[in-house]
Design a protein with these regions (language model features):
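Conserved beta-strand-loop-alpha-helix hinge in the C-terminal portion
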Residues: 146-173
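ABC family nucleotide-binding domain
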Residues: 1-142
Length: 173
């Protein structure tokens, strides 16, 4: 694939949830959620409606015209999730989505991601927190660029590469 084709795949198939939200401070929530849809060529009226629906879905329907600075960290993260959902992606990539949140708000975000998974989305969650990782169905653990564990979260007998057991190699970098 060339660069334009890869950009189309990213725009149409993937939704990104960033650790630091990456909301544009001068735009309100609807406008923030619209940004990736604008790049996808979605007409303005449809963008607005999809942004509104996505924000309502994450519990921010009453904050549509708020700027990011008017929101709590948890609300900003939910706005980031809405932005990821508005494009109706098959796969959601979440980079440490609870890292900057208090434990209660972090649980709410995880519950939302679990609901998205139950609704048919593939959710790839990157975390350093084992208490979050074990809530997944599958864990792929990396160390120094090597896969050292790939298995079900509740299956301690899952495959561990020889590298993780002290050997050399065996995993995929």
């Amino acid at each position: 694939m060339n660069r334009d084709e890869l950009a189309d795949v990213r725009n149409e198939m993937l939704g990104f949830i960033f650790q630091q939200y990456n909301l544009l401070p001068k735009l309100n929530l609807v406008e923030n959620v619209e940004v990736p849809l604008m790049y996808a060529g979605v007409p303005r009226a449809e963008r607005r409606e999809r942004a509104r629906i996505a924000l309502e879905r994450v519990g921010l329907g009453d904050k549509l015209k708020h700027k990011p600075s008017q929101l709590s960290g948890g609300q900003q993260q939910r706005a980031s999730i809405a932005r990821a959902l508005a494009g109706e992606p098959a796969v959601i990539l979440a980079d440490e989505p609870t890292g900057a949140l208090d434990s209660r708000t972090g649980r709410e975000v995880l519950e939302l991601l679990q609901a998205l998974h139950a609704a048919g989305h593939t959710v790839v969650l990157i975390t350093h927190d084992n208490s979050i990782a074990v809530q997944a169905q599958r864990i792929i653990r990396l160390e120094d660029g090597w896969v050292v564990y790939d298995g079900l979260a509740n299956a301690p007998e899952a495959v561990v590469t020889p590298r993780a057991a002290g050997g050399k190699g065996g995993g995929a970098p």
